[in-house]
């Protein structure tokens, strides 16, 4: 079983619960589909956990909040911008380096892992209607 974790956004409790559930279900592959940070109170802790899993063979993908947290330009709403500004001050150098190193996409066997669009992994389109939601099915960042 593959455990797909997306949009944790610095939420320690959510990450802990998701990882515990994946372990209970005996996941043999872990994929973090982006947005490890942003909004939540524990961006460093969440990033450290992802780093531990990646060191053991997990995949981690860059999300738009991760990119913004390490200074890559991306237009965000004022609330997200404030959260990212706060997050930047909480991340240590090694955590920032890890986030900076994350790829936009990883292809593995018959799967493509991305945070947003498989057609344009470097663009993060917001899901604003049912049509876009349909196109975004089974990827992170969709928040559907």
Question: What does each of the following model-derived ranges do?
Answer:
Residues 1-56, 142:
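N-terminal active-site segment of His-dependent metallophosphoesterases
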Residues 46-114, 119-140:
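Active-site neighborhood of divalent metal-dependent phosphoester bond hydrolases
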């Amino acid at each position: 079983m593959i455990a797909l974790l997306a949009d944790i956004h610095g939420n320690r409790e959510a990450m802990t619960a998701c990882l515990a559930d994946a372990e209970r279900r005996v996941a043999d592959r872990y994929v973090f589909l982006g947005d490890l940070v942003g909004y939540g109170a524990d961006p460093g802790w969440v990033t450290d956990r992802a780093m531990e899993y990646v060191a053991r063979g997990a995949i981690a993908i860059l999300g738009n909040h991760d990119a913004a947290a390490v200074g890559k330009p991306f237009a965000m709403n004022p609330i997200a911008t404030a959260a990212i500004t706060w997050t930047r001050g909480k991340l240590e150098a090694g955590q920032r380096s890890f986030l900076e190193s994350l790829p936009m996409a990883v292809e593995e066997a018959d799967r493509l892992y991305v945070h947003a669009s498989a057609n344009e992994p470097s663009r993060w389109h917001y899901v604003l209607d049912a049509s876009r939601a349909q196109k975004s099915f089974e990827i992170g960042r969709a928040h559907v």
